[in-house]
Amino acid sequence: MAAVTAAAVSTSAAAAVTKASPSPAHCFLPCPPRTRAAHQRGLLLRAQVSTTDAAAVAAAPAKKEKISKKHDEGVVTNKYRPKEPYVGKCLLNTKITADDAPGETWHMVFSTEGEIPYREGQSIGVIADGVDKNGKPHKLRLYSIASSALGDFGDSKTVSLCVKRLVYTNDQGEIVKGVCSNFLCDLKPGSDVKITGPVGKEMLMPKDPNANIIMLATGTGIAPFRSFLWKMFFEKYDDYKFNGLAWLFLGVPTSSSLLYKEEFDKMKAKAPENFRVDYAVSREQTNAQGEKMYIQTRMAEYKEELWELLKKDNTYVYMCGLKGMEKGIDDIMVSLAAKDGIDWADYKKQLKKGEQWNVEVY
């Protein structure tokens, strides 16, 4: 499973942060300096686009260099390890898919008492109770964090997960249950849970409050993006006010499998100019050609707009979910890049170096 966390918040920082009012104060951070990768990518773009496009790129305003999110000294990793995990309590565990959905997904909240300082985009590990068939403790499983650094209760003392119960039939016709996912989905409030981490820097949010952030998720891959979006639209900070574009694409099999839709509806109503969301419901929707509506199919409807955004130094793409989504998205980008005479594989490498293409699939 993919992994993700939220920010370590010091006592003074926590005091400076409150839940958002209907009209939060506008606070802007300076735009960060340009990385070498961004510079190289600019050269690549200039060398390969048509004369018209090259002129447009050359005329674009100069960007300041970006500060790498991975070099932030405040990001904590591996505070708790498997041999000495943190033991939290389950405070809440709720099924968030409808009864007729193909599979169960649960949203759960654990107490941390502020001892697991995480950031949006990180993950935690969970060790299920009991032992394996060899009599040894179960190995940890990583899960993307689904809450902002403040947590669902806004006090920086909880962490939330979004977990799908794994149940399948093997080649021998036996029903197999995933050890950790079933342990988590069966947790009752008050139960202990062993937690490790936080871990990961790949999926950390960009610091630029004016960034364009494109989020591509399938199923429980929505977890890190819920953490992003809560920070952007449900919370108020003295030093951060999101004023860019957050564009979410979420792919699920059925409408009864849509996760956190009510929350996203509220965000859309609150910030219609800053938040867009498009769903791809593969078993219920088709495109104009009658093809099933997968996430890449939905993205294809906006491909020119997405490509124009990808040419900008302040656009960041995050992908989380099933590994199969990656190829379909690459196929779209290959054809779009080719129209501008750009090799997508090379261009994607430059995006990755500039921390503008971030992938966590499983």
Curated annotation (Swiss-Prot):
Record's keyword terms, sorted:
Chloroplast, Disulfide bond, Electron transport, FAD, Flavoprotein, Membrane, NADP, Oxidoreductase, Phosphoprotein, Photosynthesis, Plastid, Thylakoid, Transit peptide, Transport
Give the membrane topology, semicolon-separated if more than one.
Answer: Peripheral membrane protein
Which superkingdom?
A: Eukaryota
Q: Which CDD domains match?
A: CYPOR_like_FNR
Q: Which cofactor does it need?
A: FAD
**Cellular component terms (Gene Ontology):** chloroplast stroma; chloroplast thylakoid membrane protein complex
Question: Boundaries of each FAD-binding FR-type domain copy?
Answer: 83-205
Please tell me where FAD binds in this chain: 141-144, 162-164, 168, 179-181, 220
User: What post-translational modification does the entry describe?
Assistant: May form interchain disulfide bonds with LIR1.
Per the entry, what this protein does is: Plays a key role in regulating the relative amounts of cyclic and non-cyclic electron flow to meet the demands of the plant for ATP and reducing power.
Q: What is this protein called?
A: Ferredoxin--NADP reductase, leaf isozyme 1, chloroplastic
Q: Which organism is it from?
A: Oryza sativa subsp. indica (Rice)
